């Protein structure tokens, strides 16, 4: 049996699929992965065949200017078209297709799977995105009247907005390969049987009328040692505070403001350069900049983790028992910020842009013995087998060819 995994997103979208790929392979199936060209080295590390699809996922971060509305429209057009152009050859002979991340790409992937008669599966990294009549949808970043309409109407409004953005492009490509038009974009891309690749303690699945399954987060154990230089820095003093924004750019002056606040608490700093290639504001001996490292090990040796609130970073920090301060920038990050605060394992910063005072106050909470104790306690409840659970679920579903889980 051969399985195709596909995504066009950033590290936060690709890394869970890397974990799933390894666990599917462990069960004896062949696996290949369609992903941006940036993923070549990572997939080579774990021995998963890589089919480069689409442009570099780093391109939006490395732009000199912010994305405009026209840029977003062009990206959407290309994301949908790329799936129709590239996925068919990669999916040929596969028994199933699994995708995560951008809806614009997912609807293209499912269309190809439909044409080839291949079962299709979609996984969320955040339960708040699972459509439900019992809680409101996450904001789409556009003017909304959601406070004046009921919850099902809010989801339908967002679904119609998705159709307005994607429907014409999608159905044009579908018509070209002999497929009927799609109107319900959410159900088509997400299916009525989605998976939730998030931890049930950190991000519990809420009531939904869909046949959703929560597997736990898809995280591959990382056995890599820390570099001698980083290990020496850690050994040279008390646990530092980690600062990083992953594959996002940092808000203006956020690095300087954060380091000033951390220093004011008498703590050292580890700055993750990330995709934006962040730099330290000075050459102080109390700061250390890092590139690619084993965060699973590193987070177990820091006093706190200040980050953007991506699902992957939040899960890894929670599993390591590290207190967190989340500066949510977009998408599912406000949700994870709220959950960290609700669990008592850290602080949800009010808004994406920190000030010295706001971060100082957040650190005053995150660095307390009480927060550390709570983070340690919650760490013991976080599942470590999510990718293995999903791999078994996938292969069992395909083998049984159950209509409730196949396209």
Curated annotation (Swiss-Prot):
**A Pfam cross-reference name:** EryCIII-like_C
Q: Does the keyword Phosphoprotein apply?
A: no
InterPro entries per the record? EryCIII-like_C (IPR010610), Glycosyltransferase_28 (IPR050426), GlycoTrans_28_N (IPR004276), UDP_glucos_trans (IPR002213)
Gene Ontology molecular-function annotations = hexosyltransferase activity; UDP-glycosyltransferase activity
Q: What is its EC number?
A: 2.4.1.310
Effect noted on mutating residue 125 to A: No decrease in catalytic rate
Task: Give the GO biological process terms.
Answer: carbohydrate metabolic process; lipid glycosylation; vancomycin biosynthetic process
Gene3D superfamilies per the UniProt record, alphabetical: Glycogen Phosphorylase B
Q: Does the keyword Zinc apply?
A: no
Q: Which family does it belong to?
A: Belongs to the glycosyltransferase 28 family.
Remarks, miscellaneous: In A.orientalis different glycosyltransferases are involved in biosynthesis of the vancomycin group of antibiotics. GtfA (AC P96558), GtfB and GtfC (AC P96560) are involved in biosynthesis of antibiotic chloroeremomycin, while GtfD (AC Q9AFC7) and GtfE (AC G4V4R9) are involved in biosynthesis of vancomycin.
| Name used for this protein in its record | Vancomycin aglycone glucosyltransferase
């Amino acid at each position: 049996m051969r399985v195709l995994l596909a995504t066009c997103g950033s590290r936060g979208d690709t890394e869970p699929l890397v974990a799933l790929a390894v666990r599917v392979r462990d069960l004896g199936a062949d696996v290949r992965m369609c992903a941006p060209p940036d993923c070549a080295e990572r997939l080579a590390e774990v021995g998963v065949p890589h089919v480069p699809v689409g442009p570099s996922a780093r391109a939006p971060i490395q732009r000199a200017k912010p994305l405009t509305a026209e840029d977003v429209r062009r990206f959407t057009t290309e994301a949908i078209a790329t799936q129709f152009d590239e996925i068919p050859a990669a999916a040929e002979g596969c028994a199933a297709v699994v995708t995560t991340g951008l809806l614009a790409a997912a609807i293209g992937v499912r269309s190809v799977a439909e044409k080839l008669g291949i079962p299709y599966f979609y996984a969320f990294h955040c339960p708040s995105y699972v459509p439900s009549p019992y809680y409101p949808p996450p904001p789409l970043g556009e003017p909304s009247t959601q406070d004046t309409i009921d919850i099902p109407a809010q989801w339908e409004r967002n679904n119609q907005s998705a159709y307005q953005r994607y429907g014409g492009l999608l159905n044009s490509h579908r018509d070209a390969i002999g497929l009927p038009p799609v109107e319900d974009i959410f159900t088509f891309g997400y299916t009525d049987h989605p998976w939730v690749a998030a931890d049930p303690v950190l991000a519990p699945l809420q009531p939904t009328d869909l046949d959703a399954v929560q597997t736990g987060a898809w995280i591959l154990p990382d056995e890599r040692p820390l570099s001698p230089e980083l290990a020496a820095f850690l050994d040279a003093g008390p646990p530092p505070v980690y600062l990083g924004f992953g594959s996002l750019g940092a808000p203006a002056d956020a690095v300087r403001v954060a380091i000033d606040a951390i220093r004011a608490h008498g703590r050292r700093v580890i700055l993750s350069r990330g995709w934006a290639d962040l730099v330290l504001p000075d050459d102080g001996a109390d700061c250390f900049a890092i590139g690619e490292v084993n965060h699973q090990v590193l987070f177990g040796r820091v006093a706190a983790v200040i980050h953007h609130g991506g699902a992957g970073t939040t899960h890894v920090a929670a599993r390591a028992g590290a207190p967190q301060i989340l500066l949510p920038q977009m998408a599912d990050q406000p949700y994870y910020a709220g959950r960290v605060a609700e669990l008592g394992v850290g602080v949800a910063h009010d808004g994406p842009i920190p000030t010295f005072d706001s971060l100082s106050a957040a650190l005053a909470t995150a660095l307390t013995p009480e927060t550390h104790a709570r983070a340690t306690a919650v760490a013991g409840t976080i599942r470590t087998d999510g990718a293995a659970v999903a791999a078994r679920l996938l292969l069992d579903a395909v083998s049984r060819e159950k209509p409730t889980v196949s396209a």
